Amino acid sequence: MKLVVTEKNDAAVKIADLLGASKPKADKVFNTPVYRFEVEGEEWVTIGLRGHILEPDFTPSLTYKKRGGWEGVTAEGEMLPAVVPDSLAKPPFKKKKPFTADGVELKGWKMEALPYLIYAPIEKLPKEKDIIRSLKNLAKKADSIVIATDFDREGELIGSDALSCCREVNATAPVSRARYSAFTKPEITHAFANLVPMDDDLAAAGGSRRDIDLIWGAVLTRYLTLVKFAGYGNVRSSGRVQTPTLAIIVERERERMAFVPEDYWVIRGAFDGAAAAGPTPGDGPEAFEAPHATARFKAEAEAAAAMARVEGAVSARVASVEKKRRKVPAPVPFNTTSLMAAASAEGISPARCMRIAESLYMDGYISYPRVDNTVYPDSLDLAEVVNAIAANPAYGPYCKQLLSAGPLKATRGKTETTDHPPIYPTAAATPDDLSAADYKLYNLIARRFLATLSGPATVEGTKVTLDVAGEPFVAKGDVLAEPGFRAIYPYGLKKDEQLPALSEGSTIAFNGATCTKKQTEPPARYSQGKLVQEMEKLGLGTKSTRASIIERLYQVKYVQNDPIEPSQLGIAVIDALDKFAPHITHAEMTAELERSMDRIAEGEQTKAEVVETSRNLLAQELANLMPHSEEVADALSDAVAADAYVGPCPKCGKDLQLKASHKTKSMFIGCAGWPDCDVTYPLPKGKIEAVPEKCPTCGMPQVKVTAFRSKPRVQCIDPACASNQEPEVVVGKCPVCAERGLDKNLIARRNPRTLKRSITCENFDECATRYPLPQYGDIVPTEEVCEHCGAPMVVIKTARGPWKLCPNFDCPGKEEEEKAKAEKKGTRSKGGRKTASKK
């Protein structure tokens, strides 16, 4: 039996479907799905992992013996050697936590244990015990094993860990590696026909990253959390890549705060090419505006003098007309970073982009999405890909045009690697095949691919210099003369700015000028897409980790909004670390560690060397921080309070703050004077931010609430405020009471205490009928009742449009709808799809 180990269950299904001579048989081993099939008479079994099945963790304690030195003690009592520097104290210790008679306890979060934690041995613990059990059961019976996880550092490490589990029960079975870049039949068939050995160096590079990130993340996060400060939430996160990334954002904010705006004046003239003199209506097809040749007047007097000279003028002389054509080259193929940047410009965050891309890859619509490469390999049949996606009517005519123009030639980026090709579509998809968000990203990728096979666009630029009473004005216009790649790839395309046909020496109407005072603006904040590009430029993170790092900064409330703005807490963390341990916040050290991991992958360094260097670097930074813990604590405490501030308490005058319930983790507003002051206000679900504006109705503070998939809305924090009141709406008759012969109404209302909306029976005390409602949107009753449960149908009107629903969560019809959706999705995934792959 040949055992094939994949990274996820979906991959196990796909490979079994693509390789099997007939439909694979779905089975279970200890509750883990596996898929059995035959290839040329041989039994094959695929099993999908759940990503990493082993995870690194510190030993729970360290112990010291004079003869043996330091050792880590695992949970099972096994002893692992530890290299702890002589500068750290040795036993005997007084028995005061975290110290024991002969060592140090590391499991509890204690400040005194952090210097020792840096040097604690790291063991690999089972993360997915059920899957490991199933894997070993199959491995025991296997004649050969194929590791078919994703081909990158992370995938090689996952495969290496899976192999180590297999080797515990089968030490002799031959092992090979399948490398592929897309879930298409030609690609998977080629990969399994050309198996290669495992790459131990690549796995070691992935392992070093996990170990180093564990050490830095655990030590710095514990340090920032253990220095006491007020505020909602407990853990304050930090990490090897996360912290310098935050520092980039904070540094840009410092530049903005230090920026001193300067006044300048802009003069714009109004012209009309349809007349020789003004004034004219100014709204005809040949009317246009042009700025003064001096784009910015730095002195108001100079601008006023220019305005005085053109005052009263009614005509302008066309001094010169220049036309020039320029080529705009077609874009290069997508790698991960450029895809995230382009998707961000279309409103898809980097983290969401990668989630969607992973889904499209697993469903066989695009190639592997975590790549650095920007050059298509010779093995990729470009014409075959074009033919495959031509099934989409939106691309069909353009694909035919490309194929009829001769041999296809693609653009080339600066980065060429041999592991995976750039991201390209592998199968045709239409809006009917995918969700709106998934198709939006697929469409971007497919159009980008076609654009890379297209010619440059030609833009004709026109520059007209106009003379008004001796004052020069300059009008510029751009027109797309030859669309080239722009015919299929409209992203980032500027609207044509067409000027009327003007001849040199002619006279046209001048309709006056305006002078506007403006100020220079500070450097722009980073968008998520721009930040990903900056991280790549500085060597922070990898193509696989950058999106999740940015997402993490939002989760721990270090940043907010997009473009990205640091919170007071985020600024305080960087200020404190930058003052006492600056290397932690600087990109250079992290980038050097990334280069060291590259050298591990190339076999030029060992994992042990790189991890040891990293431990020593962190130990020095922690030694710099420890004496200044009180200062760090004060800075963080003030920042958290500032971020949480909502307004003054109406009862005692102290600060009202955003807080999180320790029990439910839900947000509420409470007074900083608690327990002496018990003022609290409930908050709806969603992202909550304080806003400076007071409620125009009652004068209380307001907050901005962003509910899931909803637009932000500002509301008063006081539930009793008239602005929070909604009229009760009778939506229909209660079906429960009707069965009892009672005529009772169902009423939609908002609870004044919790602010939650629901439909309740006016006879609620006896019948207890209640249906939840969406928290936002106008409620419109209908005269219809649900055919499945008898509940009244209601219409919810939101900014996205009206939608009708049955409010009963337990309605049998909902289960039928979900079943129908699942069947529809399954039919699509099994349906025939034209695919393309490498030769």
Predicted segments, located by residue:
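Basic, low-complexity terminal or inter-domain segments flanking catalytic cores
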Residues: 2-3, 165, 221, 258, ...
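A short structural micro-motif
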Residues: 362-363, 556
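Helical mechanochemical/support elements of P-loop NTPase systems and associated helical scaffolds
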Residues: 11, 124-138, 154-162, 184-188, ...
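Intrinsically disordered, low-complexity regulatory segments
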Residues: 1-218, 225, 406
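C-terminal or mid-to-C-terminal helical accessory/interaction module adjacent to the motor/catalytic core
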Residues: 141, 185-269, 324
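Long, highly charged, low-complexity internal segments
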Residues: 39-47, 51-124, 233-358, 362, ...
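Short, charge-patterned binding micro-sites
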Residues: 184-186, 367, 373
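Short glycine-centered, acidic/aromatic-flanked micro-motifs in structured strand/loop junctions
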Residues: 149-151, 341-343, 370
